[in-house]
Amino acid sequence: MKYISIILLAWMTFNRAGQDLYVCKNARINLFSSAPIEDIKAVSQTGASVYNPTTGQLGFSVTIRSFQFAKSLMQDHFNSDYMESDKYPKAIFNGTVKEPVDITKDGSYPITAEGSLSVHGISQKRTIPGTLVVKNGVISMEASFMVKCADHHIDIPSIVFHNIAESIKVDVSATYTKYNPTN
């Protein structure tokens, strides 16, 4: 809730009050790394997102420590050795959905979000393809993309080079509800 409040406050600063905003407090974000020795999977179900269908503005935020791994040792290494989660606690995307979407009509809309992805303290411009689905007034969004560790200065020691891929697959799934400031 804390992060959604921060995102909303930032959005309210730049957007006119009263515009329809949609929020998601439990976006699911999967990480997958395939390497010769082992595959590594992690999931967070606490991502926060805000979408403004009028302007196309889209924001995501996830706490790095919220990712859960099958092996606790992997999770410890992820947070302390690679992501430095105490120093860089969140990954954030701020951008715009380029295609206009009529949220009053049910349908599946291919979309492209352009913006900045900040991971490990390094921001990179990204163009992320995805799908926005409107069904019975419910908006959901899915996206899948690759992130190179080197793009965000995430160093992989040579001793574990065969354990961790140079690029991580990221899958995002979010279902939105209309923002109600009284909730």
Each model region followed by its residue ranges:
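Low-complexity, acidic/polar, glycine-enriched regions of mature
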Residues: 17-183
